[in-house]
Curated annotation (Swiss-Prot):
<keyword id="KW-0963">Cytoplasm</keyword>
<feature type="binding site">
    <location>
        <begin position="500"/>
        <end position="501"/>
    </location>
    <ligand>
        <name>S-adenosyl-L-methionine</name>
    </ligand>
</feature>
<dbReference type="InterPro" id="IPR029063">
    <property type="entry name" value="SAM-dependent_MTases_sf"/>
</dbReference>
<feature type="transit peptide" description="Mitochondrion">
    <location>
        <begin position="1"/>
        <end position="10"/>
    </location>
</feature>
<dbReference type="InterPro" id="IPR025792">
    <property type="entry name" value="tRNA_Gua_MeTrfase_euk"/>
</dbReference>
<keyword id="KW-0949">S-adenosyl-L-methionine</keyword>
<dbReference type="Pfam" id="PF02475">
    <property type="entry name" value="TRM5-TYW2_MTfase"/>
</dbReference>
<feature type="binding site">
    <location>
        <begin position="472"/>
        <end position="473"/>
    </location>
    <ligand>
        <name>S-adenosyl-L-methionine</name>
    </ligand>
</feature>
<feature type="binding site">
    <location>
        <position position="434"/>
    </location>
    <ligand>
        <name>S-adenosyl-L-methionine</name>
    </ligand>
</feature>
<comment type="function">
    <text>Specifically methylates the N1 position of guanosine-37 in various cytoplasmic and mitochondrial tRNAs. Methylation is not dependent on the nature of the nucleoside 5' of the target nucleoside. This is the first step in the biosynthesis of wybutosine (yW), a modified base adjacent to the anticodon of tRNAs and required for accurate decoding.</text>
</comment>
<dbReference type="Pfam" id="PF25133">
    <property type="entry name" value="TYW2_N_2"/>
</dbReference>
<keyword id="KW-0539">Nucleus</keyword>
<dbReference type="InterPro" id="IPR030382">
    <property type="entry name" value="MeTrfase_TRM5/TYW2"/>
</dbReference>
<dbReference type="GO" id="GO:0005634">
    <property type="term" value="C:nucleus"/>
</dbReference>
<keyword id="KW-0819">tRNA processing</keyword>
<keyword id="KW-0496">Mitochondrion</keyword>
<dbReference type="GO" id="GO:0005759">
    <property type="term" value="C:mitochondrial matrix"/>
</dbReference>
Amino acid sequence: MVSKLSLFRANSLPFPVISSYSARFILKPYPKPKTLIFCVFSSNLSSTTFPYGPSLLKGKKPVLDDIRLASIGRDRDAHRGKIGEFDESIEKDVLLNEDEFTRVFEISAIRVPAKDCFALENRLRGHLLNWPRIRNIARVPGDEIEEDVVKLLGRETDEEEEDEDSVVDSVNRRIRGKAEGDGERLSSVLHRDKLARTFNSTGYLKFRNLAKISRPKRKRKTERTREGKEKEIASRRNEMAVVEVVETRGGEEDFEGLLGEGYGSRGRWRGSTRLLLLDEKYSGEEVQDLPEAIKVLFAEAKMADASLSFELVKCRLTLFYDYWPMIEILEAVLPKGMIVPSAFEMVGHIAHLNLRDEHLPYKRLIAKVVLDKNQPKIQTVVNKIDPIHNDFRTMQLEVLAGNHSLVTLVVENGLRFHVDLARVYWNSKLGTERQRLLLGFDQNDVVCDVFAGVGPIALAAARIVKRVYANDLNPHAVEFMEQNSVVNKLEKRIEIFNMDGRRFIKAMFSSEKGQKVTQVVMNLPKDAAESLDAFRGVYNDRHRDEGLSFPTIHVYGFSKASDPEFDFHERIRIALSEVAVDVKMRKVRLVAPGKWMLCASFILPKNVAFSRKNLSYVD
């Protein structure tokens, strides 16, 4: 069944779904995708204008033969390996068939000598393919042959072979210190001195890359398959693109029976060659129909040396699933008109998605594409199920693809943080804001972090300031913060507490430690502003004339008001029971439509610190 392209916007492909119980197509997108997903494209492309470059709509789909259908079973096994411990019931919900994204493009190419390919590439740059992630210079089987086979084919060249005697003389001079005709042999002392001059402390002076060149190559694991063709297809699938020569112009000898596949109609061997891939608009053209620059190239080659292997060939460029970017795959998979989830947060090896309700029927399909297109950096894809409501600010996450490990390592501001997203809170989007806050600290400061989490601010500040006092209510966060302080060798510069934020403020400022605190950070946007009431009366047991210093407080909060700065300022004044509070307000980021995250910085007012309106704290 063929759908009309005029109904679809560019680069958006509706995917009908094939049920595992029926082979009929379902034209309307079903809310829950099943088993294998296939594309339907229009066969009438002449009336549609496509942008330059490759597209899933422009290429031809290869015909699925028996071997390619058999490879789908390998895809299913590979899928099981990628999703780790997922149940088979989950796997049956959706399986993306990567073969459906293979596209074949018919193009033309010029076969040129390998030694001239880079110069010719610069000369013909405007007439070459110039597709993203596709090199204009391509290699195919048969462009290089071993020397023994070249002699068998009878190479015609004017270049003289290197004299074997000169090679022997060079070896003798290197090993024995002399060669025939050099006169007397060097003494052992002079020979060692001569060799020593070619060395330095790092190895060979004249051959600095000798150690790298001499290093043995890595052994690659080869898959064992029953048939050679299956092995060839499996190796191709690991590549983004493959170029094959389909047809050459002119009569030539066929060496396929002698040398095997890939060494077909090549004529007499004239040396190493490469392919210069021409623009797709020149596909199927003869030499006389090509641009003048290319015709001049052929004319110059013919006049200079008739033995040069300049010839126009017809090629087949195959682009596999790995070539297409994530956005294009998702646009093809999701129904027409649906917003493509293109952005996600990275926490170590974990990709954190925030999918809309319309994406939920396709969540595992989306997660697989995200995992495939971002490996090996991404090994786990999760989605937040519900908004954050608990006191520990931990998120309810659902693992959609990859392994189930939510313990990861995050590097920020040159520090390493071990986090477990299932038990602690972490937001990579606030990395820039944390860095901005740290720029306001100096070596004379003493920092008190009331809601420290796993320590992104506290540990980073410990490298700058005199002392850091960090606290968090979540015992798991405290455990990870202690571990991170040891990992980053900062355990001697930070003191960690596990208690409620209000009680921590009261206990800290009622002790001698609180007298030295110059900076207070309260990064808990949901409740931090309301926790400011804990500062009322913190200096009641001291005299007003002691010359006390009052800390600068940095408090974060959310606001959905039309004027978020005014709303947040009012909440701060209400919590402190003080009207005259000079606050520096700053918008941090837009969390959701109409919801801002803000940062307010102010010096603790003297009237608040000596207020007699003490609160009674309840366990």
